[in-house]
Swiss-Prot record:
The lineage of its organism: Bacteria, Pseudomonadati, Pseudomonadota, Alphaproteobacteria, Hyphomicrobiales. NCBIfam families: moaA (TIGR02666). It is an enzyme of class 4 (lyase). S-adenosyl-L-methionine binds at Y46, G86, S139, M209. This is GTP 3',8-cyclase. The keyword Iron-sulfur applies. Its EC number is 4.1.99.22. Binds 2 [4Fe-4S] clusters. Binds 1 [4Fe-4S] cluster coordinated with 3 cysteines and an exchangeable S-adenosyl-L-methionine and 1 [4Fe-4S] cluster coordinated with 3 cysteines and the GTP-derived substrate. Residues 24-242 form the Radical SAM core domain. Belongs to the radical SAM superfamily. MoaA family. Monomer and homodimer. Its cofactor is [4Fe-4S] cluster.
Length: 348
């Protein structure tokens, strides 16, 4: 598989009309995140309420329809696709879509990857590798099994560890994602860093984002990563490096471990100026920005005709509405989310 990780790998040949999707601010849209389901087998406190109401299954696009949509985006210049959720691996027959997309690697698509909570990885790791998946993100906010249960509500820490083991054994590279939560896991980040780097994994820490009504108070959870970095620099030597994965993280090298640590800071230092992505939901709704409510309905165009001309027109129109930046802000006055939909709808 050709990869686009850092400066390694060779990108697949590009057509003469490569990167035809250019937004109003001159940014090429080359990255599609596909939320294949809003359902999850965890109920992480910063992501969703414990008693969630999920989309009726009849409202979901079929996997064949999602494949067709992804193919349309690849034809329009998308080079990287990430499957997300909810938890993508709980979608019934999800490996069908993975297999179909895997066939497009080297034929327009450079990379297929996914973000997962790890709970289903032990069952799917080998097949993911066989389909061309070479790296994944695993969400892990703590190494303490009791705290893990508290934050995920329903999660089994041992199953996630089994999944990480299985993925690494299969040859898949892993990046751990940890949401930094004040008073909960901020003191644990050094341990997460050592754990990740000790197993050859990158670690990225993320500021909590104000999306959807949850049971917790985000104003209590929010931790600026500038503060976290200052605390880490009391223990580690952090050197800024020019390392890119196509995402918003800014990376440092941890001299004591030799590993990489990423910071995703939507609240304190947004990454909008280099945004190269759009987000497709399992119902065919396209969000041009994670932190805005504007969206385009692609399902109608998809189902109107078997020809893709109308679909391509709908995609083009949507890209013209991609905003300059998001509207994230922690509202300490009213304690309400900046965006009403939950993270599980658009997949981060």
């Amino acid at each position: 598989m050709n990869t686009r990780i850092g400066t390694t790998g060779n990108a697949s040949p590009l057509a003469a009309d490569a990167y035809p999707m250019i937004d109003p601010f001159g940014r090429a849209v080359t990255y599609l995140r596909v939320s294949v389901t809003d359902r999850c087998d965890f109920r992480c406190t910063y992501c969703m309420a414990e008693n969630m109401t999920f989309l009726p299954k009849k409202d979901l696009l079929t996997l064949e329809e999602l494949d067709r949509l992804c193919s349309a985006f690849i034809a329009k210049g998308v080079r990287k696709i990430r499957l997300t959720g909810g938890e993508p691996l709980v979608r019934k027959n999800i490996m069908y879509l993975v297999r179909q997309l895997g066939k497009k690697i080297g034929a327009g698509l450079d990379e297929l990857t996914l973000t997962t909570n790890g709970s289903q990885l032990s069952r799917h790791a080998e097949e993911l590798y066989e389909c061309g998946v070479r790296r994944i993100n695993v969400s892990l906010d703590t190494l303490d099994p009791e705290k893990f249960r508290k934050i995920t509500r329903w999660g089994d820490f041992s199953k996630v560890m089994e999944g990480i083991d299985a993925a690494q054994k299969a040859g898949i590279r892993i990046k751990l994602n940890a949401v930094a939560l004040k008073g909960f896991n901020d003191a644990e980040i050094p341990d997460l860093l050592r754990f990740a780097h000790g197993r050859g994994m990158d670690l990225t820490v993320i500021e909590t984002m104000p999306m959807g009504e949850i049971d917790e108070d985000r104003t209590d959870q929010y931790l600026p990563l500038s503060e976290l970095r200052a605390d880490l620099e009391k223990q580690f030597t952090l050197t800024d490096i020019d390392y890119q994965t196509g995402g918003p993280a800014r990376y440092v090298r941890v001299e004591e471990t030799g590993g990489r640590l990423g910071f995703i800071t939507p609240m304190t230092h947004n990454f909008c100026e280099s945004c190269n992505r759009v987000r497709l939901t399992c119902t065919g709704t396209l969000y041009m920005c994670l932190g805005q409510n504007d969206a385009a309905d692609l399902r109608a165009a998809l189902r109107a005709t078997e020809d893709d001309a109308l679909l391509h027109t709908a995609i083009d129109e949507a890209i013209t509405r991609k905003p300059k930046g998001h509207d994230f802000i922690i509202d300490r006055t009213h304690n309400r989310p900046a965006v009403a939909r939950h993270m599980s709808v658009t997949g981060g």
